[in-house]
Amino acid sequence: SLLRSLAPEDKMPEATLFETRPAHWYFERPVLGATRKGSQGDQLYVADNPPFGAVISYYLRDGYPTQTAARQETESERLEAGNTVAFPGWGVVEAERRETAPALRIVIRDEGGSVIKRLDAPTAKGLHRVAWDLRHPYYGSVETPPNWQGLSPSGFMVKPDADYTAELALIVEGEARLLSGPVTIRVNRMTSPALQGAEIDE
């Protein structure tokens, strides 16, 4: 399990992308109706299902705060210790205003090594989980808002019974750096069709 692979914090690298469980490939469908409870009313209790797709876990030893957040944390520690805090200077304030916040991306690649999706990921210190919905990005010539159910347009499903890879990358001031990975994501068809159809590649 994931917890068994964790080491003491002082021995952990800067970032660790953990191996993932095989993901089940299927099409979600509503059971009670178009909305969560359908027409059953609020007396019906429902709970969230586990995230659909491949759940990708990673650990950040220190996190990647913005310059403003790092300065404010240092100032808070000084105030808690009973010390005063000085104005950092206009140069520092202007640099913080112009800074582009560090960003983490989980990069999904297919068997040929081509990038098929990039997932936004939290940059805070600690353990995080991000779910990939097993879909390509949505490409539309016109921006389409979410529908009345709050669902945004999505891309096509990826091919089942195939291996994909995930990498964890950090982007700071436009420069990307690989932190961890790649790890393999196996996508398995959940059920076999009753009738034999065409090959999935067709």
Descriptions of predicted regions:
Residues 1-202:
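C-terminal low-complexity, glycine/proline- and small-hydrophobic-enriched intrinsically disordered tails
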